Every structure is written in C-alpha cells, then in structure tokens.
Amino acid sequence: MPVHWSKTGSGGVMQKEFTLGIEEEYLLVDRDSLQLAEAPEALMSTCQADFEGQVSPEFLQCQIEVGTRPHATIAAAREDLKRLRAGVSQRAAEHNLTPIAVSCHPFASWKDQHHTRKERYDALQHALGGVARRMLICGMHVHIGVEDKALRADLMPQLSYFLPHMLALSASSPFWNGEDTGLSSYRLTIFDNLPRTGLPPSFSSWAEYERTTGILVELGVIEDTTKIWWDLRPSHRFPTLETRIMDVQPRLEHALSLAAMNQALMRMLCRMKARNLRWRHYDRFLVGENRWRAQRYGVGEGLIDFGDRSLKPMTVLMDELMGMLSEDAEALGTLPEIARLRQIAEHGNSATRQRRVHAEALARGEDAGRAVVRHLIEEFHADL
C-alpha cells in the first residue's frame, strides 16, 4: 500500500469509544402489484408507538425511515436494526404492504408520488421546487460518535478519501423509471441536483466550519445545518460525523458491514492522530473522480489509488484496506463484517445482483421489473 499519511506535528488522545448509529430509508410496495404504495396513517402511528421515536415518515408518502439508538458495538446495532426491519415489515403486512431497502424502485415513476404533508416537507417542496419532486430515492446514513469538535473538523477531509469506496460497495440503484441507467448508483444523480450536496469542503478548524456555514444561517438562506447535505457532515443534532454517501442496502448484513467500515476507519484515523500522523489530503477534484467512478461502475472497474497514481480493482483496494483496518476491526469485534465487504468487491454489489435478476427474467420471458422487486423483497427479509 503506498504511503498516504504524513506527520501532523501534534498528537492526540485516542478515543475510548466509537459509538455508531444507523439510519435507513425504505420504500413501501404493494404485495400484489409490487408498485409503490403510500403509507397509511395507521401504519405510521403503530410503528411510532412500537418503536418510540425510531420510525418516522419521510419526504414522500411511499417512504419510511428508521434509526437505531447509539451503540458501542456492531453486535448491538445488529439487534436494534434487525428489530426495526422486522417490526416495520410485520406492521406493513397488516396493510398488504412490504418494505424494500433499495435506493431507486426499478420501475415506479416519480411523477405519481406525493410528498408527506408536514410543515417541514411543505417548506422543503417550496424551497426546492421541481427538484424536490424527483426525490424518489432512499439512502443510508451512518453516525460515528466524535465528542471533540476540533477532531470532527480534522477527520472530515481524511475520511472523505474513502467515501467513493463506500459508494462503490453500497450501490443499489441501477434502474430508474423502468430503464437501466447504465449507472450503479443513479440515486446520487438525483440527489446531486439539490444544493449543498457532494463531497464536503475541507475546513482547517471547527471555527472555520462554523463561520462558513454560519453565513448561510445568519442570512436566513438555510434554517440550520440540517439543510447542508454533503456526503459527509458533522451532525447538527448529535456529536457525530454522519456519512451520507451510501445507497441503502437490501441486505441487513451488508448494511452492518458498511457501518463497521465507517467505525473502523474512524478508529484508524484517530489511532494515526495519536501517533502524530494523518491521512494525506487529496484535492476534491481528484476524490470527485473516484466518486464518479463508483457512481458509474460500482465495484466493476476499480478506483484510482492516488498514492501510486494507478487504477486498482476493488478487490485489491479492499485487500489493502482490510490490512490497514485489521487492528481496528479486531479491537471493535468487526473482522467478519469487514471481510464481507471483500466478498462484495469480488462478487458484486446490489446493483450487480439486480441486473443479474433482471437479465435472467428477460431470458425467461418474464416481467423483469417485477422480478427485481420480488428479489429485493427476498433480500430485505433474508437476514431477519
């Protein structure tokens, strides 16, 4: 692995805990037609009663969002997220609906969807205009606890280097409006139409971050920093860094592996800082090229290793990353989860699997879009 780190000149105390939380957005589909369906009021109210604030409506009425509690371990997060997935599925079944965890429905039209009538979403629709109407997309967000604000600002540009890797592994949105887009993550194409998205800027300090974002807040351009939708951002509500670039995962275990990757990377970067080292900062333009490659090809064509200026297959990159993260994954108890990412790099991500199902259904003369949705339903329930 080429050297990507350099001396910082100042050390730091290693964090004792790297708590994590996972947020997922699901689509609701009718069990018979496999078309998108709006969440009945009774479904939302029972889910909210069952899970005490861990389930909420999303921008579109066909969406539902879940969020785990903060956890110190992936094992604890697994139980929480499994409980949420299973619970939402059981409640949805009472209305002949089922959730799927995918970033774009294979054949639904955004023109047929309606946004949730809440003051927050009404304001968003007004602010974003026609851009908001096309937001028929779902994502996955991972929060990692970082108590120190200065450390959050320091870690952001370092962790940004790995955002394309996370996107490549997670890509689950090859289809849009019934067509193969040629991309592995079409979700990002839609999301990037919003303002204040993409790779985060690099800030020299927490004070600079607050000054910069504060300009928009002070002028009334945005209400607060929740309206900043970078791929990675400091959370407005929690003392965390929130990774937002990933497509949502049909499989529970794949979601947990990506969360484990975030947690282990954060621990590795803090461990380096304690030794007066830091991951080398690469220009946003260069990391953006890897972001595009991940969006377009997923794990299929590899990413650029800027340390030795070469294109490398995802399997090679994951072998190198696993070597770097082994100490951290062992300390966190997540070696199996990190190893699963190597399997995704080798055998394909969700976009790969969806295209395979689509092609096989076409070869049999079946409705390929419906076959993909049935596949997504199976994957949602596979690990429960």
From Swiss-Prot:
<dbReference type="GO" id="GO:0004357">
    <property type="term" value="F:glutamate-cysteine ligase activity"/>
</dbReference>
<dbReference type="InterPro" id="IPR006336">
    <property type="entry name" value="GCS2"/>
</dbReference>
<protein>
    <recommendedName>
        <fullName>Putative glutamate--cysteine ligase 2</fullName>
        <ecNumber>6.3.2.2</ecNumber>
    </recommendedName>
</protein>
<keyword id="KW-0436">Ligase</keyword>
<dbReference type="InterPro" id="IPR014746">
    <property type="entry name" value="Gln_synth/guanido_kin_cat_dom"/>
</dbReference>
<keyword id="KW-0067">ATP-binding</keyword>
<dbReference type="GO" id="GO:0042398">
    <property type="term" value="P:modified amino acid biosynthetic process"/>
</dbReference>
<dbReference type="Pfam" id="PF04107">
    <property type="entry name" value="GCS2"/>
</dbReference>
<comment type="similarity">
    <text>Belongs to the glutamate--cysteine ligase type 2 family. YbdK subfamily.</text>
</comment>
<dbReference type="InterPro" id="IPR011793">
    <property type="entry name" value="YbdK"/>
</dbReference>
<comment type="function">
    <text>ATP-dependent carboxylate-amine ligase which exhibits weak glutamate--cysteine ligase activity.</text>
</comment>
<keyword id="KW-0547">Nucleotide-binding</keyword>
<dbReference type="InterPro" id="IPR050141">
    <property type="entry name" value="GCL_type2/YbdK_subfam"/>
</dbReference>
<dbReference type="GO" id="GO:0005524">
    <property type="term" value="F:ATP binding"/>
</dbReference>
